[in-house]
């Protein structure tokens, strides 16, 4: 076993990768410990259960991704460009994951969220919903600004953001099911169509 000081971080990293490349339900504590190089006793020193570890791991991953999304959706960036950058980021990120793991992984929040939504222990589902709501708000702000600037037709940005987020969720899920990055290439085309944007530029990815 490595140093106890980094065992918690290695457990979270192992959990994130295992549930992303596989599934939450199929991932066992033994598998997590093996991948992290941590003994089971150390697992229970840091976490009382697999659920607690998963909540911590997804929260940690979100905090690592958040600065990049903050930059993409900065109010200093024109609203339609924010949406384009978001679509481009999603494609590039999935391409990097495919290069590393050999397949398109999609978004773990969507796949794990669907998997645990009927579980009696709601902690993981609640954490996923919390993170997804943060992501949706990025879209809502960009949509509101685009409408205010006369660039889009979205008088109800909250509703429009939920529709657009569901569209992205569908694309990510289909890309994983089909193991096909091309599903994500025209995300901006559908985005502009849903928002009533008149001009759609070719995808940059």
Model-assigned labels for residue ranges:
Residues 10, 18-60:
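Helix-turn-helix
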Residues 98-123:
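Amphipathic alpha-helical segments used for helix-helix packing
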Residues 81, 85, 118-147, 186-189:
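Amphipathic alpha-helical packing segments from all-alpha helical-bundle domains
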Residues 56, 70-105, 158-164, 205:
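Hydrophobic alpha-helical connector segments
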Residues 1-6, 201-205:
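N-terminal intrinsically disordered/low-complexity leader segments
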Residues 80-81, 104, 126-130, 148-163, ...:
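All-alpha amphipathic helical-bundle segments outside canonical DNA-binding/catalytic cores
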